[in-house]
Amino acid sequence: MKVAVLGAAGGIGQALALLLKTQLPAGSKLSLYDIAPVTPGVAVDLSHIPTDVEVKGFAGQDPTDALVGADVVLMSAGVARKPGMDRSDLFNINAGIVRNLMEKVAVTCPKALVGIITNPVNTTVAIAAEVLKNAGVYDKNRLFGITTLDVIRSETFIAELKGLNVADVKVNVIGGHSGVTILPLLSQVEGVTFTDEEVAAMTTRIQNAGTEVVEAKAGGGSATLSMGQAACRFGLSLVRGLQGEANVVECAYVDGGSEHATFFAQPILLGKNGVEKVLPYGEISAFEANARDAMLDTLKGDIKLGVEFVK
């Protein structure tokens, strides 16, 4: 099993690479790529950790060597948010980065499962899809926007609010991966009841959690460590699915035939071909239904931006 991390020298990339080095199955290969010259050194640093995961690092303009034979590609390359920016402000820089990297993926490892971390995810996943379509290798079951950070934040915040063991908290987050498009389905959390005020406050906190971190870091970065953990969880789930493990379910932003938008985050069953099945997200409350319907214009606009960028 070979996993490639693109953008591996950045804050998210290094955290993700560390977690993968310690958690990937024995015998796996971990391939790190970044434009930054430090990248081979990051690989050497990680190689001293005593796990049976081989690490190699590649720097420079061309990620091809890092991508050869990759089963899973996790893309975190791009610039991070600073105070006063929202995820859409990142579009102007990150759109081109994602396009260029995906052109290499399309040629070098078109069958790989690709998880996009680079923001704005609502748009960058659409860019990735268009690049793969133009190359004639698009498979909607192999492309994912990683929204796991919204899920782990939801789990954490709910456990804190209600005094629960966080390992027991399960919550689906649907929609997209920015602002109002992030919709945690709090009505479905088992064994917990929320007041209307708690639902409104919790939903807003989850939607704005990225900004909470950006402001707390005071210009020193964005959510890198928690995003690294979220991406590792999702990446390991992709690997487990590829290895034939049963009942591997995660939420992700996918081209899954949703009635709501071309790309929509909801629970998916993972397997040997990526998405084995898009799962229904179930009964939702009136508050959630209203929030879902209200986000769709924003989400569709984000997707359209990505499609038009590649044209």
From Swiss-Prot:
A GO MF label: L-malate dehydrogenase (NAD+) activity
Pfam family, one: Ldh_1_C
Reactions it catalyzes: (S)-malate + NAD(+) = oxaloacetate + NADH + H(+)
Record flagged with keyword Oxidoreductase: yes
SUPFAM superfamilies reported for this sequence: LDH C-terminal domain-like (SSF56327), NAD(P)-binding Rossmann-fold domains (SSF51735)
Keywords: NAD, Oxidoreductase, Tricarboxylic acid cycle
Protein name (database record): Malate dehydrogenase
Species whose genome carries this gene: Shewanella frigidimarina (strain NCIMB 400)
